[in-house]
Amino acid sequence: MAIKHDDGTVLMRQEQKLKPPSMYQVLLLNDDYTPMEFVVMILQEYFSKDRETATQIMLMVHRDGKGICGVYPKDIASTKVELVLNHARKAGHPLQCVMEEV
């Protein structure tokens, strides 16, 4: 689409094809010290999981060594990881939270 101005300049609109943002999964990693109830609370508070879903994810973390909390664009995933790590440290728990590109 061309736009012509009074001074004779012509501007051409260039079509841009935006690719979707890279997505990252946020994972909680198992440890032998963080209470299961704390993990459930983290999943409810930071990932908006209901109690049943949070409990299922917590059991997956306990059984399999890690559990997926959700999949988000990079900035959101990074923010969630930092929030979880800060909360865990303040509570005195060694809970690990990481993100991986999907």
From Swiss-Prot:
One of its GO terms (biological process) is protein catabolic process. Signal peptide: none annotated. It holds the Pfam family ClpS. Binds to the N-terminal domain of the chaperone ClpA. Belongs to the ClpS family. Involved in the modulation of the specificity of the ClpAP-mediated ATP-dependent protein degradation. This is ATP-dependent Clp protease adapter protein ClpS. It comes from Herminiimonas arsenicoxydans.
